[in-house]
Design a protein with these regions (language model features):
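Long, charged N-terminal interaction/targeting segments
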Residues: 1-65
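Cys/His-enriched microdomains
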Residues: 71, 89-92, 110
């Protein structure tokens, strides 16, 4: 259950930034999490509310935006969206040139994108 450790870091970042801004309350936290990250959103939300209890972030809404996994062919530059858990990535070849040499463009992110305070 790595969601707990990740969420502890998120709450720490949120509280440090809210304290620096002299906030009275954190009302919303927006995360951007890539599809490649193996995160259970419900579990992360539950962990967030558990960890934030008793802090100025205890009533904050946690919003999680999933970032699609996009790969790019190193040979021709063609980009492709991969869907995880479909076996899509195991035998992927470029539809344009037929090669199978890719690198990740996006989908591995884990960002605290926005913190709303009052």
């Amino acid at each position: 259950m790595h969601e707990m450790a990740l969420t502890e870091n998120v709450v720490d970042i949120v509280l440090r930034n809210a304290t620096m801004a002299e906030a009275k309350e954190v009302t919303r936290v927006h995360l951007q999490i890539g599809e490649l990250r193996d995160i259970v959103e419900k579990l992360m939300t539950d962990c967030f509310h558990y960890i934030a209890k008793g802090t100025i972030a205890e009533n904050a809404a946690l919003e999680i935006e999933r970032i699609p996994l996009i790969i790019q062919c190193r040979n021709c530059g063609e980009k492709k969206h991969l869907k995880l858990h479909t076996g899509d990535g195991r035998t992927t070849t470029c539809e344009k040139c037929g090669m199978s040499n890719f690198h990740i463009i996006q989908g591995n992110e884990f960002l605290v994108d926005d913190i709303e305070i009052i």
